[in-house]
């Protein structure tokens, strides 16, 4: 069946609107849970969106619904990368490291997991580009381009922002969130 141009524009508009709402909720969550690193992640995610739109424009690609899906998937992957990094930082702080050391070690420990996850997704995107048809290729193209951009924003821009905030005076462990206390219930002892 053929859809009207108005129906396609309406779906595109609603997708963009939903993406913006989701983006705001994600940033609020990152700020609440990760504090200062969450602020850095928010700016890194904004950088991702800006760079992605510049790349789409630079490659003269049209923004379609499958393209938006690729962008949103990459935003999710970027959030995941930042969560992995900041969880590592919190673990290092909880283990008694200084904030400076925790930032350095946290990024170092998280990098290989983030790169590995993105390589597997890139392989899938390349297979979709190779074997897919029209809309699938549009999704795969934005996904592949977005992987490189979100790796850059997660591992370079986010790192730079965290260090910048650290050097601006945000050096207390409390600014980086607390490792949650793991509560265990000792059922055997309660008898």
Question: What do the PLM-derived regions correspond to, one by one?
Answer:
Residues 9-64, 130-134:
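Interfacial segments of transmembrane alpha-helices in multi-pass membrane proteins
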Residues 25-31, 77-81, 127, 149, ...:
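Hydrophobic alpha-helical membrane-associated segments
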Residues 1-5:
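A cross-kingdom feature of multi-pass membrane systems that activates on extracytoplasmic/periplasmic
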Residues 55, 91-191:
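Hydrophobic alpha-helical transmembrane segments of membrane transport and translocation systems
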Residues 38-60, 71-76, 139-154:
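Small-residue-enriched core segments of transmembrane alpha-helices in multipass membrane transport
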